[in-house]
Amino acid sequence: NSRDLCMIEHIPELVKAGISSFKIEGRAKSAYYTAVTTNAYRHAVDDYFANTENFVLKPWIKEELDKISHREYNTGFYFNHEPGQVTGNGGYIRHYDAVAVCEKSIDDSTSIISQRNKFYVGDTLDVLPPSGIPFLTKCLSLENKDGIMVESAPHPTERLTMKSDHVIPQSSVIRKKK
């Protein structure tokens, strides 16, 4: 199949059908993919059980799944309104890069991060905290391990001190729109 299964918009139907747990399908999914997908489905399921009668999927939850590398989404064989198997262009859609992980929050604006992909001072970054709702922040400055201010983070796994305009919780994934 050249598309990826996405059932986030059908949580009520799945729960009513007796499904009580969800599994991430596919081989070699990254930690970033797993974190984003787990966070989205966890919020969707919790929101559904908090308000089963008037459940509406919050737009940010579905938007999260567009921030991971994926092929075009469909619902597979679950419903009859589209083909369950599609054999066409199976190209991947990639709108975001995971650029860092927050190792430690020092204060309201300073974090120790481990770089994953290149980004620059001044970039708007999208933060996925370990729990809670993702938020945007701006990279105000970067300092390398020698205390030298740098304009970019070009070296994978480099530890940097980053100042931003928000507190970034420890273990947050920091990403950037391409």
Would you name each region that the model predicts?
Residues 1-178:
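Surface-exposed amphipathic alpha-helical tracts and adjacent flexible/coil segments at the periphery
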